[in-house]
Amino acid sequence: MNISVIGTGYVGLIQAVGLAEFGFDVVGIDIDESKVKALNRGECPLYEEGLEGLLKKHVNKNLTFTTSYKPIKDSDVIFLCVGTPQDKDGNADLRFLFSAVEKIKETIDKEDYKVIVIKSTVPVGTNRRVKELLKDYNVDVVSNPEFLREGIAVYDFFNPERVILGFENLNNKKPIEIMEEVYKYFKDKNIPFVITNWETAELIKYASNAFLATKISFINELAKLSDKVKADIKTISYAMGLDPRIGNKFLNAGIGYGGSCFHPDEVLFIDRGRGLECITFKELFELEDKDNVKILSFDGEKLSLKKLKLASKRYYNDDLITLRFNLGREIKITKDHPVVILEDGELKIKLTSDVKEGDKVILPYGNFGEEREIEIDILEELSKTDLIEKVWIHNKDLATNEFNIIKPYLSNKYPHDVKRNGTIRAKDILPIKEILDKYGSKNRLFTAKSKSTTIPYKIKIDKDFARLIGYYLSEGWISKDYGRNGVVRKRIGLCFGIHEEEYINDVKNILNKLGIKYIEKIKDGSHSILISSKILAYVFENILNCGINCYNKNIPPQMFNAKEEIKWEFLKGLFRGDGGIVRLNNNKNLNIEFATVSKKMAHSLLILLQLLGIVASVKKCYNNKSTTMAYIIRINGLEQVKKIGELFGKKWENYKDIAESYKRNIEPLGYKKSDNFAILEVKEIIKEHYSGYVYSVETENSLLITSYGILIHNCFPKDVKALIKQFENNNIEPILIKATDIVNEEQIKWFFEKIKNYYGNLNGKTFAVLGLAFKPNTDDLRESRAIKLIDMLLESGAIVKGFDYVEKARENTINMYKLDKSKGFYGYNLYVLDDLYETVKNVDGIIITVEYDFNKEDWEKIGNLVKEKVVFDGRNILDVEKIKKLGFKYYGVGR
């Protein structure tokens, strides 16, 4: 039997390889010529355990790939496995499916019998529409939805829990018999076959995934009732699971659904058209427009950009796992997230919970995409802002030579003033701005009629300007002050040590070439260069996105698309500022260090270095009693040190002899290099409880580069939203399905309402909140459930006394509420105390919000201190029987 598989994405490639393993002659068809060529070389674009081995086993034997549809003429069965991506509302995009059907119509003979199998995930009614398109052809259409789980998809293909087959007419045995022959392997293994109609088969796929979410939401909802009637949700879940009609899976209250996910502060790298941006998962989710976002990924040979398919978030109350690797790199993810592991020379997938110390991950390096010359059209960028109203252009030649062309567009009361002084309102020239190109750098922009500081209307990011950006990121800042009548003025400053003459002169020469005026200030051993220009400040802050101070500095997106020589010049300015050369081992060895307090700057620099083949280590620390995290990036290994060391200019001469005197070529420490990636080992695995949102993404190749440049698998998708949309498209309100999301979002509100219902009115009530940070033994308040609950209590008029065992957590809470007085007034309705027993004194209720072992405290003493013996245990941490014997009323979560 000859089989064709149209579409060689995730589903299609596994289907083609699997059928080839069954012994069929299989042709995979895809419109991507480069992918087809790679597949015919045995190169697998997806990372699934066992997939590449099977591909190499069968390719160019009984498995081939092509961009042509001609092979389907000789195929008995044609599988449609093209993508049907969902939009933000859950609608399936069926354009690729129907396009493939049209290609089939153009290729096959109307009289030749074919079985066309739709494996793509499609809405109900799609198979019927396809048959209608093929009504003049001798074909049967079969619905055969896939149930592959990313990370173990090859295993799932060969070991399905059931095979779903939907047909137009169950009395027509021909297509049924053919499909049973195709899947004889499963028949022989006694895998259940469900033979049904089209619509039933289509709905089974969505219903299965959505039901898992519904099951979880059900148990979470039941936990609320359990609280109300004083039952124990843990015992209920266990007992329910013993019933074979129900089963014990997905019955853990409070966990929620949504698959694998990232901590909100983890980062990834996106491209929205200008170049790579370092962005947190939370920030990506909050972007209003994600339609054209691409994600930095890895295609097996090199770094590449892949389209973002989906970004989502969910509430999570369970363990997060931090995987720590060599070189100070790490990632924090949920325990069920798929991790890309290098094993026996192949990339495989493991769930986070299965990862062990010593497992290997990879850091891809090398350039991606097309490098190009980059020019900033400053006038065009300003035209999109209110600042354009205050911008002028000075060009005497333009005003004189082109006056008759310009005159109709002038808003001046006396147009000939323009011809006389050569100064034009920028907004007047916009309709004919192309005329400026004739005069190039003579077009000067400014925002004050004095023309004290002007800049070119376009700036090319050449070697000089790339160095200037680097100097700015290391030594620069943007300040704002106010002149007469409240006029805002902005200045760019760069500050060097007076001994850094080479770097000072370099900056001055660059500015002189651009015709940009500056002033110099020398004081107390420092040499500052100051540029008063609101426009240039806008370029650095808003066009290049460089940031304005050390805390928010970042590498411009444009730099990642620049030519390699430009990248090196940028690094030259960067390392000359905040970089340093360090002698080691009694002056026998060297390494290079770069320090920053900007998290995004650190992550972006690591990626930029990886693009250039440099692999660095990173250390997070607090320097000199600072409360701000610093990132120290270190470069070692002789060849790497020499490459970066030469960027320092004359300073390198003081260290060059040490590098030249190395007795052997010392390789970099902490990793091994392959042709296109570095290999790191898992050194430590840390588990910690987390309550808060986690974020998911899906990319078109299921891979992405995340924090510290690590390659990782994307998240597992869910079908709840798609099913909701199909309900709505059929004018049915999906009450239960919609509720699955709502239940999982409402847990903290429900817990608050539980407290409120006990008292009736919280106004004037005093509560001890035990635990302030988001988890035990930390001072981190981000995503803290305690803080969110405190806000709710304060808004209801309650008085809150907070306590945490960690001193810094207490300090951070005090500082946070002193800065933001919108909800709490520290010292009036909010107090943070250093002693637990002082905290509980005279309170109306105790609320536990963090998983500390409060059982070790003296609850008899606590009972004598409180006004009312009532405990709201948000973590189910206390010994219930012990507490009740002491006279406390106890309220847990589902207990």
Swiss-Prot record:
Question: For binding NAD(+), which residues are annotated in this chain's numbering?
Answer: 2-19
Membrane spanning segments where? none
Post-translational events: This protein undergoes a protein self splicing that involves a post-translational excision of the intervening region (intein) followed by peptide ligation.
Domain DOD-type homing endonuclease spans what residues? 468-614
Which residues are named in the active-site annotation?
A: 261
Q: Does the keyword Oxidoreductase apply?
A: yes
Enzymatic class: oxidoreductase
Q: Which InterPro entries match?
A: 6-PGluconate_DH-like_C_sf (IPR008927), Hint_dom_C (IPR003586), Hint_dom_N (IPR003587), Hint_dom_sf (IPR036844), Homing_endonucl (IPR027434), INTEIN (IPR006142), Intein_C (IPR030934), Intein_endonuc_central (IPR004042)
Which GO terms fall under molecular function for this chain's record?
A: endonuclease activity; NAD binding; oxidoreductase activity, acting on the CH-OH group of donors, NAD or NADP as acceptor
Q: What is its EC number?
A: 1.1.1.-
Q: Name one Pfam family in it.
A: Intein_splicing
Gene3D superfamilies tied to this protein: Cytochrome c1, transmembrane anchor, C-terminal, Hedgehog/Intein (Hint) domain, Homing endonucleases, NAD(P)-binding Rossmann-like Domain
**Record-level GO BP terms:** intein-mediated protein splicing
Keywords recorded for this protein, A-Z: Autocatalytic cleavage, NAD, Oxidoreductase, Protein splicing
Could you tell me which NCBIfam families the record lists for this protein? intein_Cterm, intein_Nterm, NDP-sugDHase
- PANTHER family, per database record: UDP-GLUCOSE 6-DEHYDROGENASE TUAD
Family, according to the entry, reads as follows:
Belongs to the UDP-glucose/GDP-mannose dehydrogenase family.
Q: What is this protein called?
A: Uncharacterized protein MJ1054
